[in-house]
């Protein structure tokens, strides 16, 4: 009997907490998945339009921002390939 009463009180408390928090966030969570999907698409577009170094710009072997590839040259600094 005590366990049943404790469960009922706990359920009422949790229900009250949910109702209180939904009143606080009314209008803020609307279309949450659509907004996150739009943000993800914008991020993908941003990644696809990343600026790259011009051809013949100096680069590093492992860390470069070349549009195509970093061309290694003997006894000279590597440059971005055309």
From Swiss-Prot:
This protein's UniProt keywords: Cleavage on pair of basic residues, Disulfide bond, Knottin, Neurotoxin, Secreted, Signal, Toxin
Domain of life: Eukaryota
Disulfide bond annotation, renumbered to this chain: 52-67, 59-70, 66-80
Location of this chain's protein in the cell: Secreted
Organism of this sequence: Conus miles
Comment field on protein domains: The presence of a 'disulfide through disulfide knot' structurally defines this protein as a knottin. The cysteine framework is VI/VII (C-C-CC-C-C).
UniProt protein name: Conotoxin MiK42
CC annotations in GO: extracellular region
Range of residues in the leader sequence: 1-22
């Amino acid at each position: 009997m005590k366990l049943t009463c404790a469960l009922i009180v706990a359920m009422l408390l949790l229900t009250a907490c949910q109702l209180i928090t939904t009143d606080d966030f009314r209008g803020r969570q609307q279309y949450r998945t659509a907004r996150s999907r739009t943000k993800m698409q914008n991020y993908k577009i941003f990644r696809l339009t990343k600026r790259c170094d011009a051809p013949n710009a100096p680069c590093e072997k492992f860390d470069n921002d070349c549009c195509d590839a970093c061309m290694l040259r003997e006894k000279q600094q590597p440059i971005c390939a055309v």
